């Protein structure tokens, strides 16, 4: 199981939002590439990055920062936020991104996912309040069901689902283990969990999660790392221990 340390970029800064609220932002640094390099040096096998400005507007104004991360680190980079067209995805791939995460556009235009999946690594990012999927930087609820949407992409050729429980994001109060178990039971596509991780025990609960013989591909952690609840190296060790037991 892989750790995906998170770098959320807004106005060129490394930030975290609380429950996806743009008015509840904490700034942790002004150099995303430096932060990514620090994560990689501690043993992160991937970096997860979100362009918060693009998630809201679709304008990839942080593309230069993302390209700088890709150039700086020697590990794969997974990036989401505002990927709503073929050209937007291609700009990220051209910038050195390994895997693009399509969220709002996947929900509103599923054919885009099917068009892009043969061209490069694509993950579908599904962000939900409970089972109600939200889009446009989490600011609009769609009324679409999380599990029905996951099932609808079963034959789309995607590399992964990135599933975020918005109510837990940035809270450090623990992941939605039961909900994630249901996700695992719904799809054979690899699943990356996001939202709520605040302790090493939370990570252990995810390592031990299994449904229909499937386990999580990875977990995204952000605030817990920035608030020094644990280090990247500690988290990687816990996830590796779990994989070996």
List each language-model region with its residue ranges.
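Structural preference for beta-strand elements that scaffold enzyme active sites
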Residues: 2-6, 46, 74-78, 98-101, ...
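Conserved anion-binding
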Residues: 15, 19-23, 97-169
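Catalytic cores of alpha/beta
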Residues: 72-99, 111, 178-215, 230-235
């Amino acid at each position: 199981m892989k750790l995906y340390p998170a770098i959320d970029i807004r106005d060129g800064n490394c930030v975290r939002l609380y429950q996806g609220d743009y008015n509840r932002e904490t700034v942790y640094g002004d150099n995303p590439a430096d932060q990514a390099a620090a994560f990689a040096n501690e043993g992160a096998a991937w970096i997860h990055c979100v362009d918060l400005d693009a998630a809201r507007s679709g304008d990839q104004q942080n593309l230069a920062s993302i390209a700088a991360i890709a150039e700086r680190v020697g590990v794969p980079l997974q990036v989401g936020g505002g990927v709503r067209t073929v050209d937007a995805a291609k700009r990220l791939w051209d910038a050195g991104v390994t895997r693009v995460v399509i969220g709002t556009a996947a929900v509103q235009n599923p054919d885009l996912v099917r068009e892009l999946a043969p061209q490069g690594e694509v993950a579908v990012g599904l962000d939900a309040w409970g089972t109600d999927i939200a889009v446009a930087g989490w600011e609009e609820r769609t009324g679409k069901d999380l599990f029905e949407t996951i099932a609808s992409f079963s034959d789309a050729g995607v590399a992964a689902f990135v599933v975020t429980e918005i109510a837990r994001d940035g809270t450090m109060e623990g992941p939605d283990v039961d909900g994630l178990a249901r996700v695992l039971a719904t799809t054979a596509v690899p699943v990356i969990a996001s939202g709520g991780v605040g302790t090493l025990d939370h990570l252990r609960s995810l390592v031990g999660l299994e449904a229909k013989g499937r386990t999580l591909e990875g977990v995204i952690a952000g605030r817990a790392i920035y608030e020094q609840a644990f280090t990247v190296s500690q988290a990687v060790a816990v996830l590796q221990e779990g994989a070996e037991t």
